[in-house]
Design a protein with these regions (language model features):
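Cell-envelope/extracellular polymer assembly enzymes that use nucleotide-activated donors
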Residues: 7-9, 36, 182
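Short, well-formed alpha-helical segments that are part of the catalytic scaffolds
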Residues: 17-30
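Short aromatic/hydrophobic "clamp" motif used to bind/position activated sugar donors
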Residues: 88
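Catalytic metal- and UDP-sugar-binding loop of GT-A-like glycosyltransferases, i.e.
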Residues: 66, 91-93
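A conserved acidic beta->alpha catalytic loop
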Residues: 41-50, 95
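Donor nucleotide-sugar binding loop of glycosyltransferases
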Residues: 17-20, 44, 72, 98
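Acceptor/aglycone-binding surface of glycosyltransferases and processive sugar-polymer synthases
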Residues: 62, 68-82, 99-177, 202-221, ...
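A short, conserved alpha-helix in the catalytic core of glycosyltransferases
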Residues: 166-170, 176-193
């Protein structure tokens, strides 16, 4: 079913992103559509918290704070619980993904042609990947395709946009980075219409603050296997 003038709920998990979070919040709120921004501070220790308090007073977005670091999945689940929009998308607080591309991501959902849209970093322009991340992502995506009979190019993308009914149909349990493969597994097990579109991507290295590691890749594989055969 097509949507007219939808409200887009943007859930932004944040952990130690003081250098970039203000820019990303302002860029999200500058997108020319109706936006509900939900920011979840996962117990940052680098001064992100006071900055978020200041920005929240100025800009009026929804802000939650964890008393202890619980992981990206826990932060997302907290944010998802507060969603009131028609469509929801995940937005990381670093500068890797561009919220200016929300209108492209939302188009197929608004027209009623898709339930879920993934923004693929491999179909669009992107900064050169670290080889280990490139190979790891390709392997995990390949295994997801085999397990769920799909043809995704980028399972681990942050940009997973979906109708709110899709989100509400899933009981998400992962606390860490396993939330990404869990969402993918449950979306495909339920038979939703999924599209991919190209996005730009400016990936960062560990010296710039990247947090995901090879251990998270192993967790992703386990999550994909787990939810293929169990709910």
């Amino acid at each position: 079913m097509a949507l007219s003038d939808p409200l887009l709920s943007v859930v932004m998990p944040v952990y130690n992103e003081r250098a970039s979070v203000e820019e990303m919040i302002r860029r999200v709120l500058a997108v020319k559509m109706r936006i509900q921004l939900i920011v979840v501070d996962d117990a940052s220790t680098d001064g992100t918290g006071p900055l978020l308090d200041q920005l929240q007073r100025e800009l009026g977005f929804t802000l939650f704070r964890h008393p202890r670091n619980a992981g990206k999945g826990a932060a997302l689940r907290r944010g998802f619980a507060a969603v009131t929009g028609d469509i929801v998308v995940i937005q990381d607080a670093d500068r890797e993904y561009s919220p200016e591309e929300f209108p492209d991501l939302i188009e197929l959902i608004v027209k009623g042609r898709a339930d879920v849209v993934y923004g693929s970093r491999f179909l669009g322009r992107h900064r050169v990947f670290l080889l280990t991340h490139y190979l790891g992502n390709r392997l995990i995506t390949f295994i997801a395709n085999v397990l769920y009979n799909t043809m995704l190019s980028d399972m681990e993308t942050c940009y997973k946009m979906m109708r709110v009914e899709v989100l509400r149909s899933m009981t998400l349990r992962s606390d860490g980075f396993g939330i990404e493969p869990e969402i993918t597994a449950k979306v495909f097990k339920r038979g939703y219409r999924v599209y991919e579109i190209p996005i730009t991507y400016d990936g960062r290295g560990y010296e710039e603050g990247k947090k995901i590691t090879w251990i998270d890749g192993i967790v992703a594989l386990w999550v994909l296997l787990k939810y293929r055969f169990a709910e």
